[in-house]
């Protein structure tokens, strides 16, 4: 049967992960995302995880699927061992917030942009991204879902970290949705369509991003970690 939003929120709170996704196959694969504290409109990695479950447990013959989210249709294609997710492009808009964002990150920021959900702070090099120790309380005062910090990469085209205390996640391990903004930005700066990206959280992760006319395709892999029943 269906479960209501309040129950979804309680389950996400108990799971205590960045986001928990809920798929309703009776409603044409409607998908909902909850952080431990709030419903969010889009979560890329929870979409990839949901697609993995869909292809391996719900429809084993399918090679693509569409999830209906608060942010519109999210298409995922199965390509051998990888999953390719299509997200709407998120165009960065330059904002004059360097001082406030530098203060929140405890480092010198070169430029600041705003996407649909997040602020994007560009710093001088990848080493700064890896070593910053931000002020989470100051980031929580920003009027955004999260704050992305990024620089040109060494082994990859760009590196990033994502902080989201406003949605109950001090630092997200890997953030698919942030790459709709990151890939759009770096694609223009580096004049590239296809890029390898690294998120430098403690757990870390690498993604392949391809910038198309209206969408960003993000390629990643998923593994089954846990299977069970929830009683509520």
Residue ranges and their predicted role:
Residues 1-42, 48-232:
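Active-site proximal loop and beta-alpha junction motif in alpha/beta enzyme cores
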């Amino acid at each position: 049967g269906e479960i209501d939003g309040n129950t979804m929120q309680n389950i996400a709170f108990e799971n205590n992960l960045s986001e928990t996704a809920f798929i309703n196959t009776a409603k044409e694969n409607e998908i909902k995302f909850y952080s431990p504290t709030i419903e969010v409109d889009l979560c890329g990695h929870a979409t990839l995880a949901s697609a993995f479950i869909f292809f391996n447990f719900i429809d084993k013959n399918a090679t693509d699927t569409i999830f209906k989210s608060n942010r519109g249709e999210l298409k995922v294609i199965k390509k051998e061992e990888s999953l390719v997710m299509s997200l709407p492009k998120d165009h960065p808009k330059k904002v004059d917030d360097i001082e406030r964002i530098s203060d929140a990150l405890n480092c010198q920021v070169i430029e600041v942009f705003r996407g649909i959900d997040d602020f994007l702070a560009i710093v001088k090099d990848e080493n700064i991204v890896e070593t910053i120790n931000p002020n989470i309380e100051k980031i929580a005062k920003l009027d955004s879902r999260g704050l992305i910090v990024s620089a040109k990469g060494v082994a990859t085209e760009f590196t990033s970290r994502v902080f989201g205390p406003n949605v109950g996640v001090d630092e997200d391990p890997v953030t698919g949705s942030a790459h709709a903004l990151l890939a759009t930005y770096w694609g223009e700066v580096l004049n590239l369509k296809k890029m390898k990206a690294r998120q430098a959280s403690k757990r870390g992760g690498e993604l392949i991003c391809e910038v198309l006319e209206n969408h960003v395709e993000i390629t990643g892999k998923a593994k089954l970690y846990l299977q069970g029943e929830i009683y509520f």
